[in-house]
Structures are given as structure tokens and as C-alpha cells.
From Swiss-Prot:
It comes from Proteus mirabilis (strain HI4320). InterPro entries: Mechanosensitive_channel_CS, MS_channel, MSC/AndL, MscL_channel. This is Large-conductance mechanosensitive channel. It is a multi-pass membrane protein. SUPFAM superfamilies: Gated mechanosensitive channel. GO terms for cellular component: plasma membrane. HAMAP family: MscL (MF_00115). It comes from the Bacteria. Channel that opens in response to stretch forces in the membrane lipid bilayer. May participate in the regulation of osmotic pressure changes within the cell. The gene is mscL. It is found in: Cell inner membrane.
Amino acid sequence: MAFFKEFREFAMKGNVVDMAVGVIIGAAFGKIVSSLVADVIMPPLGLLIGGIDFKQFSLVLREAHGDIPAVILNYGAFIQTVFDFAIVAFAIFCAIKLINKMRRQEEEQPKAPPAPSAEETLLTEIRDLLKNQQK
């Protein structure tokens, strides 16, 4: 029973939960970026360079013979995946840069001086009383 209690405490720690949320959001973000590259960026890019569909780029290493399928190197899909990676890496870079900038701004803000301790307050009152007596 102690094993499950220890596992539950581990799983409920803030860092583990935050990481799980990040992984789930990252997976969804990856799908969005893949669609952006495949459906928005690559078609106009292919059109600009002569109506080329990058997904169709391939090199046949061995033709199909009977029941043996062809061996094909689909480097067009690889090019598209490289674009996916570049966009994801750029988006993560921008997000981390923004987060670091916000952290630096928080650190640069001057912190309010700590409230005087009870001893300091008492000494201040004594000082003020002594000043008033001297007048």
C-alpha cells in the first residue's frame, strides 16, 4: 500500500502534472503545425517553383516485381517534415524567449523593503518619545 501512496504523491506533484499538460498541448500543437505546413505553406511554395507538390518527390530504388513491392525513398515527405520541425522549433524559441523576458522583468522590479520587525518598531517609538520629551 505504501508503494501506491508514494506513486500518488509523485504523480500529483506540480512538476509532473505541468509536464503532462505540456506534452498533451505539445502533441496538439504539432498537429496544428503539420497542417499549417502541409495545407498552407507547401502548396504556395510548390506553386512558386512551378506547381510542384513536395509530397510527391520520391526516388524509386527498386521497381516492384510480382508480389515484391517497390522500394521507394520518399524524400518529399522528409522535406515537409523538416519544415514542420523548423516551424515548431521557431515557435518554441519565441515562446521561451518571451518567458525569459517576462522573468527578467519580474526580477528587475525593485522589491518592497521588508516591514520593520517588532523590535525596530519599539525602538522607533522610544526614539520618538525621547524626541518629544526634549522639546
